[in-house]
């Protein structure tokens, strides 16, 4: 049995924490190894409910200074220290055990014993680094929020969740407001999303959740996901979660706004993506899904992430980080 300490700078609702939980959980349940969680207690963006969720499954250790990490790793007789990073070598590695670095945004500064990326589409010299992708494992759950939110069953609903400030393309904000104002039977629901326009009854904001059933309930409420992140995605966990629940993803390649955009969402979705720009978004939101074609749209295959199951990904995790 291998003992792995998983480090996260903070434990919150973001995708990096979600994926760290998944790696640690399936390292324990599928691979039969020991998973221990360590995090920085001084971060103000830690969320107590998330920390409690980790404590139900793992031993959790908080430290207020990274310099304390090696002393704890030595005492624990740890075999591997796993850490997620943007990609920079900022000095956060262990000197007492094998350090495996998992890069989220780029892979330009190799360091540690293993240096890997989250997708083959992140920036940097990807030919030199192995890839361990995110895994998608939302539960089967059939409820939705339409009754709770007073949304008619025949209404068209677009939604998104993700980083609070990551729905940030200005022209999308304006078009969403215009569509909602002129089409009262088209709804937009936003979870954990910064408010960006005036109030309308069919633009609904919902607080973040760490309950995966609640997350699926939110996805089930939507007919499609509307994605609008100006820097693109180096993987796109929220996109993947909507996609595995067979929801169309309405998004943009976005090269005009940002020539250095991350392009993972473009490569993953391919022909399954519904691609917008400023000139066609209004038309897409008002004609792509209608009351008349909703059922037909829902029967099509929109899942672009069939290969990212826990069983497949954790074996890649083992191959790259453990073996």
Residue ranges and their predicted role:
Residues 8-14, 21-68, 194-196:
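N-terminal strand-loop element at the rim of the active site
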Residues 15, 279, 290-322:
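A charged, aromatic-enriched C-terminal amphipathic alpha-helix characteristic of glycosyltransferases
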Residues 78, 217-234, 247-248:
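Acidic donor-binding loop of glycosyltransferase active sites
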Residues 106-107, 113-142:
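Donor nucleotide-sugar binding/catalytic pocket of nucleotide-sugar-dependent glycosyltransferases
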Residues 134-199, 205, 212:
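Conserved catalytic-core segment of nucleotide-activated headgroup transferases in glycan assembly
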Residues 216, 239-244, 258:
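Short alpha-helical segment that forms part of, or immediately flanks, the ligand-binding pocket
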Residues 248-258:
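Short hydrophobic beta-strand element within catalytic cores of glycosyltransferases
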